[in-house]
Each structure stands twice: as structure tokens, then as C-alpha cells.
């Protein structure tokens, strides 16, 4: 057997093992991210609710796609004292002293997903600082970034890895509406 063939055969046999180890690590990280997104209640706000036979239920066809673009909100809700906030029936729009906030599209849609331009590090910084991409506009209530930001780097990386591989949903979420 010539040496070039032996080298190519050895390389071919070793490559799948390396890829398999990387795939296993990535798969474990994505599974951890799915667990954290699910138990961290991300779907409660980022997955619109629809009315079903048993009342409101998550619309998993639009999982983590944020406020539905077809539901137009033009102004903050007028909330009587002593209340300080209101929410839409989909749980994707919140109104309070900060104005109106819309839950973001966390899917990897290349046109409308909010994380489309984020690096892993920017995602971590966003969760730590409460600022878009770690330095932009403030993330508005009710996003619990102060608590999510206490996750470990590994957990935040797992959440990011999971969000990068979920089905993309084209859904243009509106910009926040400032208070009056």
C-alpha cells in the first residue's frame, strides 16, 4: 500500500470521529438550550397565543416569532389607577409607563429575526446589559434580562445555539412605541 493512500484512508477514517464528537457536543448544547428556553418560559411572551377549544394556547406554528405583524398597535394603552400596565391577548404586546413593547422574533429568519445580526458574544452582552446587541437601545419590560443575565456563559451560549437552529418564521415585529 502506498503512503499517500494510507494517509488518505487514515484521514477519512478519523474525520468522522472528530465530526461526530463535534456534532454530539453541538447536539448536547442545543438540547440544553431548548431545555433552558422551555423552562425559562421564553415561549410565554415570544410565542403568540391563539384561542383554542380549551382557551388560550401557544401557537407553536409561530414558536418564538414574537408579536404577530398583522396585529397593529398604534398607541400605549390607557391603564386606570392603580394598574401600571396592560398586555395584548397574544401576550406579545405590553404597555406601561415605558410606552409599548413588542416581543421580538427570536427565530433565525434572515430578514425579520432580531438575532440575525447577533454574534454569540453580542447575545450574551445583550442578556447581561439589557441593551440591544450589548450596546444599543434599551430592552423594554417585561423582558426579564436582569435574571436571564445571571445565567452562566455556557447556558447563554446554549440558548443562543438553540435559537439559531429553530425553524425560521418570517414576522416583522414593530419597533417600540414611546410613552405619550
Language-model features and meaning:
Residues 19-38, 50-56, 111-112:
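Electrostatic cytochrome c docking/interface patches
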Amino acid at each position: 500500500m502506498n503512503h499517500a493512500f494510507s494517509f488518505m484512508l487514515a484521514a477519512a477514517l478519523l474525520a468522522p470521529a472528530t465530526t461526530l464528537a463535534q456534532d454530539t457536543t453541538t447536539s448536547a448544547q442545543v438540547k440544553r438550550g431548548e431545555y433552558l428556553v422551555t423552562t425559562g418560559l421564553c415561549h410565554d411572551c415570544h410565542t403568540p397565543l391563539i384561542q383554542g377549544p380549551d382557551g388560550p394556547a401557544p401557537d407553536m406554528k409561530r414558536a418564538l416569532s414574537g408579536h404577530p405583524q398583522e396585529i397593529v398597535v398604534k398607541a400605549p394603552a390607557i391603564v386606570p389607577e392603580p394598574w401600571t400596565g396592560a398586555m395584548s391577548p397574544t401576550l406579545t404586546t405590553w404597555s406601561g409607563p415605558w410606552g409599548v413593547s413588542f416581543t421580538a422574533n427570536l427565530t433565525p429568519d434572515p430578514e425579520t429575526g432580531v438575532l440575525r445580526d447577533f454574534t454569540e458574544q453580542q447575545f450574551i452582552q445583550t442578556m447581561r446589559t439589557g441593551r440591544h446587541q450589548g450596546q444599543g437601545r434599551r430592552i423594554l419590560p417585561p423582558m426579564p434580562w436582569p435574571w436571564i443575565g445571571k445565567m452562566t456563559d455556557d447556558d447563554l451560549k446554549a440558548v443562543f445555539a438553540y435559537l439559531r437552529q429553530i425553524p425560521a418564521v418570517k414576522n416583522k415585529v414593530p419597533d417600540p412605541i414611546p410613552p405619550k
